[in-house]
Amino acid sequence: MATPDIPDLGFDDLDDALGFDLDPLEDLETESQHRITTRKMRSDLKHETIDATKRQALAEVMPALPGPGECYHIVSNGDFDYWTWIPVMIGYMGRADEYYGSTWTMNRRNVVGMMEMIDRGLIVRAAVVTGLYFKRREPAVYATLFQGLRRRGMRFACLENHTKVTLLANHERGDYLVLEGSANYTANPRIEQNIILNSEAVYRFHQGWLDEVIEIGRDEEPQD
């Protein structure tokens, strides 16, 4: 959004500037804030449409969960991203009793989506591992993830991590999904490779090292 056109006030010296009545600028600030909020609303609606399109594209490729012992190798062309797997697979499962997610970095929209699924009971227990790059490059998004998981009693670790693994389990159904791929929890349209399988043995394999990583890599409250 363009910055409001504030005219040159033509101050001759600093005293004149310090003595200027700031009240007229308050209306400009209010107007600016209103425009920002309106723009954000448009952006949200656009992203919701895009997210729905991505979920539909993935559902066409994977119209059902892999059965126990089944494994699929998928190369995606950017029609959906790595995060799209989570809501689609949980939709098939009904809920995830456990969710483990390991990624190098993450965007804010997917962080918010994760918290919403936890709050709705679609994810019962969550454990997330990210890379230090995420903390350094996106501190505000990192803080949203860290604080959101902590408030909900979930687990989190940040360390030198570059793995991309997702685990989703529904014990009652006997589904233990493992997703391995090249992408992060972001929205970059790229050609990516994915492997998805339904195997409790492979699930427990990844769960073991992720639990260890979370124990040694637990992070502290981010500093301002």
Label every PLM stretch briefly.
Residues 1-224:
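PLD/PLD-like phosphodiesterase catalytic module centered on the HKD motif
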